[in-house]
């Protein structure tokens, strides 16, 4: 059996870039909660002892940006300079302006257009991907890297590993077999964890705790063997982390947010953007489309692309590729996808209920992936029943 190796990485919520994603989405949540028609393009950057939020926001909501920044940093665990940032003492800079009137008239006609006539907020192309290799219909390499990152945070916050600090990165290499276009995981080849820690813990303690409390509960035993390689804090020391260690910026972890390098990516980030921004809503609808194709048994693996022009409601193109795993031709699957999903931005917003903020709805997406999550707020993960005629054997 000929196999190959594929690697996906993740970072957890204390990584500086992910901190910025979460702040941007916390701002979006606050705006949408009070004013569902808010137009939000919120960026965040951070470095030692400083967080800045900036961008274009048009909203009727009353938003305390500084409080959102401090609350988000605190909830992640940035509560002192020792761990990389002090939520209560750091400088918070805010530079927010209104959405450009040129964009506003072209996209939503200054709020006068009907939902079906609302244009895309920008040009761009987005991809959705699904694969039958996991129950989530997501790539195993990505799922494991993401879940290990989430577990790191869990054992830090619940006190299991008191030496842990907020910043951390994970990476998983999986050995795969290509079954006529479908991906079949064989084993986990390598697990890499680099996590921030306090000064008191030894490297041996770190390795022992990570294996016992993080790796063992997450990676199914069937994928591990005596040849699996573990790189646990291979640099030897990771005390300085968070924004003190590295600068952070919204939108720099777009592969971690999506499919871990599988499928494809149009380049647009998600966090801090309201649903008229097709970078986000377009990527959500094509995930639902790809997932529905696989879940309905039409293919074992699917990639769906959609593209837009600014101010134009109808997509410019829709594309489907099932990597040779489709039970019917891709052109027939494409026809079913176009009949079953409304790719107009205003209609995607309604059908996926994307104007609903609050409850940390978009904040939840900003760490540990936007796809493959079992949470009713992730409306794009709901499989749509598709009508198709299965070919007779």
Swiss-Prot record:
Mostly expressed in flowers, seedpods and roots, and, to a lower extent, in stems and leaves. GO terms for cellular component: cytosol; extracellular exosome. K(+) binds at residue 43. It holds the Pfam family S-AdoMet_synt_C. The keyword Transferase applies. Keywords: ATP-binding, Cobalt, Cytoplasm, Magnesium, Metal-binding, Nucleotide-binding, One-carbon metabolism, Potassium, Transferase. It catalyses: L-methionine + ATP + H2O = S-adenosyl-L-methionine + phosphate + diphosphate. L-methionine binds at residues 56, 99, 246, 277. It comes from the Eukaryota. One of its GO terms (molecular function) is metal ion binding. CDD domains: S-AdoMet_synt. It is an enzyme of class 2 (transferase). Its cofactor is Mn(2+); Mg(2+); Co(2+); K(+). ATP binds at residues 15, 167-169, 235-238, 246, 252-253, 269, 273, 277. GO terms for biological process: one-carbon metabolic process; S-adenosylmethionine biosynthetic process. It is found in: Cytoplasm. Pathway: Amino-acid biosynthesis; S-adenosyl-L-methionine biosynthesis; S-adenosyl-L-methionine from L-methionine: step 1/1. Mg(2+) binds at residue 9. Catalyzes the formation of S-adenosylmethionine from methionine and ATP. The reaction comprises two steps that are both catalyzed by the same enzyme: formation of S-adenosylmethionine (AdoMet) and triphosphate, and subsequent hydrolysis of the triphosphate. Belongs to the AdoMet synthase family. Homotetramer. This is S-adenosylmethionine synthase 5. The lineage of its organism: Eukaryota, Viridiplantae, Streptophyta, Embryophyta, Tracheophyta.
């Amino acid at each position: 059996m000929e196999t190959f190796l594929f690697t996906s990485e993740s970072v957890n919520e204390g990584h500086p870039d992910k901190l910025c994603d979460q702040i941007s989405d916390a701002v979006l949540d606050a705006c949408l909660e009070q004013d569902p028609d808010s137009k939000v393009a919120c960026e965040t950057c951070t470095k030692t002892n400083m967080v800045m939020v900036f961008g274009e926001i048009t909203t009727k909501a009353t938003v305390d940006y500084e409080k959102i920044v401090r609350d988000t940093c605190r909830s992640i665990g940035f509560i002192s300079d020792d761990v990389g940032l002090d939520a209560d003492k750091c400088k918070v800079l805010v530079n927010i302006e209104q959405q450009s009137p040129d964009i506003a008239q072209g996209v939503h006609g200054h709020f006068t257009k009907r939902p079906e006539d609302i244009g895309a907020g920008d040009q761009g192309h987005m991809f959705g991907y699904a694969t039958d290799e996991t129950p989530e219909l997501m790539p195993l390499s990505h799922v494991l890297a993401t879940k290990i990152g989430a577990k790191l945070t869990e054992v830090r916050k619940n006190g299991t590993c008191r030496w842990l600090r907020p910043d951390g990165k994970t990476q998983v290499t999986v050995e795969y077999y290509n079954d006529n276009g479908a991906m079949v995981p064989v084993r986990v080849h390598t697990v890499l964890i680099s996590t921030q820690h306090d000064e008191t813990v030894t490297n041996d303690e770190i390795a022992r705790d990570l294996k016992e409390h993080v790796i063992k509960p997450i990676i199914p035993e069937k994928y591990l063997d005596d040849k699996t390689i573990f790189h646990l804090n291979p640099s030897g020391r990771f005390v300085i982390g968070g924004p003190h260690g590295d600068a952070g910026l919204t939108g720099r972890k777009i592969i971690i947010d999506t499919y871990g390098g599988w499928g494809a990516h149009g380049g647009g980030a998600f966090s801090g953007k309201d649903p008229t921004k097709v970078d986000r809503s377009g990527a959500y609808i094509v995930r639902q489309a790809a997932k529905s194709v696989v879940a309905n048994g039409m293919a074992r693996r699917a990639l769906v692309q959609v593209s837009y022009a600014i101010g134009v409601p109808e997509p410019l193109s829709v594309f489907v590729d099932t990597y040779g795993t489709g039970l019917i031709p891709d052109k027939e699957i494409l026809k079913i996808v176009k009949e079953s999903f409304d790719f107009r931005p205003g209609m995607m917003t309604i059908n996926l209920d994307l104007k609903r903020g609050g409850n940390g709805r978009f904040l939840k997406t900003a760490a540990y992936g936007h796809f493959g999550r079992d949470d009713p707020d992730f409306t794009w993960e709901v499989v749509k029943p598709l009508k198709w005629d299965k070919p007779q054997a």
